[in-house]
């Protein structure tokens, strides 16, 4: 596995020795919350908070890749976020394109798979083009899969899956009996996340303690970890703290031990 080169800002942060590398979560999901609060505390425009959030994403992707996380899913823009001021939405869309252009070479060099999930066709054309380009160019990589949840909503995802099942029935690709006997795993294959394993832990910074329509089907047995730190300030050390907490939990999946 190729390692990212940490910037001077990130060197020395976190303590790898505190992590049990035999029990690294396979799939980490993060609700990247608190960009606006971060900017407000500094009397900056909200767009500056979103830009700083991109820097946080960059360092967390690096660290997840380095320590052996297989899947990282980040909630970047929800189906409900369209109600925000138009200028903020437009700025977020520009930042998505800029992030992909700026970071693509390093991500690709380090074997990262870029996988957008959500109603991607509902995004502006420039975003669609940038996302599809990054996806196609990294699809044969074998390292960390970075799932970018954009124009994503858990309810929308489940409803879309049901529609896709019905469409498959109409096209004689699946029978009525097969629909009635669908397993959890088979239904999951119709979701935006496809056959990606469910998240082991969902992290939410900013102090909020709710799912906000994120991975509603997939989070059935996920562990949750909350922090009062706003996303732009989320550090490698904070990631390690969340992982160590996860490693100390007793996951029973409905059973007993």
From Swiss-Prot:
Active-site annotation: 33, 81
Pfam family, one: Prenyltransf
Co-factor remark: Binds 2 magnesium ions per subunit.
Chain residues that bind substrate: 34-38, 46, 50, 78-80, 82, 84, 204, 210-212
Binding sites annotated in the UniProt record for Mg(2+): 33, 223
Enzyme class: transferase
GO cellular component: cytosol
Keyword field: Magnesium, Metal-binding, Transferase
Coiled coil (UniProt feature): none
InterPro entries reported in the protein's UniProt record: UPP_synth-like, UPP_synth-like_CS, UPP_synth-like_sf
Its EC number(s): 2.5.1.-
GO biological process: polyprenol biosynthetic process
Family: Belongs to the UPP synthase family.
Subunit text: Homodimer.
HAMAP family in alphabetical order: ISPT (MF_01139)
Protein's name according to its UniProt entry: Isoprenyl transferase
Protein's organism: Clostridium acetobutylicum (strain ATCC 824 / DSM 792 / JCM 1419 / IAM 19013 / LMG 5710 / NBRC 13948 / NRRL B-527 / VKM B-1787 / 2291 / W)
